Amino acid sequence: MDHLNKIEHIGIAVRSLEEGNALYTKLFGVLPYKEEAVESEGVRTSFFKAGPNKIELLEATNPDSPIAKFIERRGEGLHHIAYAVENIHAEMQRLSAAGFQLLNEEPKAGADNKWVCFLHPRTTGGTLIELCQDRG
């Protein structure tokens, strides 16, 4: 059985969602199709469609949020790669058993009507991986 075989979106950390939206609108030639806040994560997000691909921009709304800490340490740029999964609980169990460190023990409500779980970059070769399942 194939696992993690479809990229759901690519997440990019930005200091300013307005500036990021302007930049990526110029780059892709389209406006973001969605903007929303995820209060529990301390972020505002916007989503772009670039052909078959989705790009998520993330701006911190809380200085203690993971995005604020990421930008403080690394600056703006690629934050995570998200993979679509059909059963997030089963994938979390499979990946945990395979030695990957989950950053949350249960799926959390994320942006774009998804259940999400992140894998620690220490266990994925330095890349933050997000699992995404439609909340339906």
Describe each model-derived feature in a short phrase:
Residues 19, 37-41:
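Short glycine/proline-centered loop/turn elements that form peptide/ligand docking sites
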Residues 19-20, 30-32, 54-56, 63-66, ...:
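Short loop/beta submotifs within extracellular cysteine-rich repeat domains
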Residues 7, 24, 48, 55-58, ...:
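Short, structured motif recognition centered on aromatic/hydrophobic residues
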Residues 2-3, 46-49, 83, 89-136:
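Vicinal oxygen chelate
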Residues 38, 56-69, 102, 106-118:
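Intrinsic, low-complexity N-terminal interaction/targeting segments
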